[in-house]
Amino acid sequence: MKAIISLLLISAMVFSVIEAVPVEEGLQLFEGERGCLPHNRFCNALSGPRCCSGLKSKELSIWDSRCLG
């Protein structure tokens, strides 16, 4: 029983540390990895629904996506 309570407390602490990083800051950290190119408003096809600077990604084809405001 003590092990379960300890595990729950550790999980809660880890979650609170992860939540301490603001979402916007987290998105900025991974913007380069997603291949966002804000100067021409294109996004990487693998970036999914998220895109550069909070823009939404619209798939024009399987290989081409454009960031829309």
UniProtKB/Swiss-Prot annotation:
Disulfide pairs here are 36-52, 51-67
Q: Which UniProt keywords apply?
A: Amidation, Disulfide bond, Neurotoxin, Secreted, Signal, Toxin
Q: Where does it reside? A: Secreted
In alphabetical order, the GO MF annotations are:
toxin activity
In terms of domain of life, where is this protein from?
A: Eukaryota
Where does this chain mainly localize? Answer: secreted
* Pfam families per the UniProt record, alphabetical: Toxin_7
Q: Which GO terms describe its cellular component?
A: extracellular region
Distribution of this protein across tissues and organs: Expressed by the venom gland.
Q: Please state the span of the N-terminal signal peptide per the UniProt entry.
A: 1-20
Q: Give all Leucine amide modified positions.
A: 68
Free-text function comment from the UniProt entry: Insect active toxin causing rapid but reversible paralysis in crickets. No activity shown in mammals. Does not show effect on mammalian voltage-gated calcium channels.
Query: What is the protein's name according to its record?
Result: U2-agatoxin-Ao1k
The species this protein belongs to is Agelena orientalis (Funnel-web spider)
Source taxonomy lineage? Eukaryota, Metazoa, Ecdysozoa, Arthropoda, Chelicerata
